[in-house]
Amino acid sequence: MDDPDDPRLASGAAWRDLVAALARAEQRVLGPGVPATPRDRAEGFRHLLRFLVAGHLLCVEHADPNAPRFARMVDPAWPWGLDMPDCLYLFAPLRGDAVYRVWGSRGTANHVDFQVNWGHFALGDLSAWGTVASASDLELDFAPDGSFELWLGGSARPRNWLPLAPNAEFLLVRQYFGDWEQERPGDLAIERVGGAAPTPRPRSDEIAARIDRLVTWLDRGGALWERMSRGLVEGMAPNSLVVTRPADSAQRAGLRGQAYGIGNFQCMTEEAVIVRFDPPRCRHWSVSLANWWWESLDFGSRQTSLNFHQAGLDADGVFRGVIAHVDPGVPNWLDTAGHERGTVAIRFLLADEVPKVELERVTLRELAAALPRSTPRISPAERAACLTRRHNAVRHRYRG
């Protein structure tokens, strides 16, 4: 197949544009107002490397809609975009005029959702991507053993089918886990119907376009998450949070039926922040912490998140989590991992109502009096065992 040289690739100009974008990205670590302790700087530059890895996967390596493969869009090794610790995110590129078959086994996750999206996260604009169509495990048919097929595009089918659109760009699969130790991911594969085999070698213009998109990912995509994080940490009152349930529409790329509570925590070493709400009836709820760069905090070796299965409710049915730097000796501890400020993210999926969430900052000396007398205690040995189980569950989810 003919492949005339792309002049920007042949001359190295496209590559130099990428190198220049990496140089510009340092301002997201060294710029004004960014946390500047040695550990923050270390975490910031690690974030840039992680964000580059994520961008390479989404913009370069898994960018061929003619030969799609599922990739982990988010991973503990490359968290970004206020990712949810309960969720395994899978991504596959699409083209709107093709037909695709997704098949495999559902797994045992608490909730599974397939979402066809237009636009791309690299564009750095919330209005630049949205939903073409979606379906969850509540709407799909599965065999008794959990196996299934889902068709994308082409002629309409009565069941297990999602339409595409001319601007469709990718399929996003979300698997929500409640019981991390017992629930297992699905075994999923995707193919373009009628696709060529073997896969042709990439053309020079294709690689140039993918590098250009990676540049956009670094410039515009990275800037978006920084603006949103900075707006929460600096633009809202300390320890405040707002819960919203956006209307499901084609202009929204978030999970259908999910309400989001997003705010900030500010907590010094000798302080704690109590997160309090009355959980609604819903399919799934979770609370998690993130750093300045909107990376979920290390949820594999620390208890930086809790969900409806992991958390305990008090006798009055209220969830009370305790954000603190040191273990306060209560089961619902949310570990700051050394961060004095960051983002709090709360999600309620398919909730019958949206609850009010309160954040209250107290000193560690005041904490016991601020919690119900019946609040259970947890010993250091019990905490260590809990963290070991958590670590093993995360390793199992992301194995391979």
Which stretches of residues belong to each language-model region?
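A compositional/structural signature for long, glycine/proline-rich flexible linkers
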Residues: 1-400
